[in-house]
Amino acid sequence: MVGEGQVVECFLFGHGTHGIHGNGGGEEKDFVFWPFSVCSVWPVGLPEKISSLQNPRVKQLVKLRDRRPRDEAGVFLVEGYREIRRALEKQVALQEVYFAPDWFLGENEPALLEAARTAGAQLFELSKETFAKVAYRERPDGLLAVAPQWKQALGDLTLPAAPLLLVVEAIEKPGNLGTILRSADAAGCDAVIVCDPVTDIFNPNVVRASTGVLFSVPLVVEESARVRAWLQERKIRAVATTPAAPTLYTAADLRGPLAIVMGSEQYGLSDFWLKNADATVRIPMAGQADSLNVAMATIITLFEAVRQRH
């Protein structure tokens, strides 16, 4: 029964199987939709509509593109259907979801919004022009969420007997860090540890490049010295990558408890890691370039470890 002051909102779905949502990167299976109208009760009415570029919420969303306002508020932005869906799947407590139907790319957005509302997020409908103002993507899909930041410590990690870890030091570019997280997820890494970061792990482009994997891979930010001591305590070998290493990455033993350590784009690993690693390895280079993109080098080394372990 609908109580006084409540509003019934109905969405009509026309699929009897998993819906498909295209988002520029291929099709993805998503929520189960049934061929009838699903009605839900909105306790305090329909989502607030915002069309003014001067609205305080719009101004705050624009500010959250920068690190200081994000850290002060303890939140960050999650843009995109796929990224928001993965956040919900991992039970991230989204605080707010902003949507603009004029930008929608598929048919499943209403179900995603309903899932977010059910999970406790506050919904706001934006005009097309207003959403273009707050979106940071060149081609937005009409969905933007505000999520709480979190901090996980080394002691919070639950690891198997022979974990595969990825340690990255002083990564500078958000796109590289996001790609590294995505690759670590694909390789089945048990955790990613970011040492002495230059870029913010909650940068919108980290979220974007990771395709939302930021929410599924255990992620710790810590100082290099503490990470090295923690690895030693747990008898996890640290294998550092450097072009000067005498051993090819394919010739090294990458089985057992292992942490692969990657350095920054410009300078590679610091002397601290090169001196304190249990072993160093290199990827052979045949051309004029003296190094690979750090994300590509990470992928190559990680999947060699995966190959050896299977």
Mark where each language-model region is:
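Glycine- and other small-residue-rich loops at beta-strand/loop junctions that grip anionic moieties
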Residues: 50, 76, 169-170, 195-196, ...
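Amphipathic alpha-helical repeat scaffolds
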Residues: 80, 172-179, 292-297
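RNA substrate-binding interface of SAM-dependent RNA methyltransferases
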Residues: 89, 104, 115-118, 124-129, ...
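Structured adenosyl-cofactor binding patch, chiefly the S-adenosyl-L-methionine
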Residues: 145, 183-187, 196-214, 271-310
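Active-site/ligand-binding-proximal alpha/beta "capping" segment
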Residues: 240-289, 293
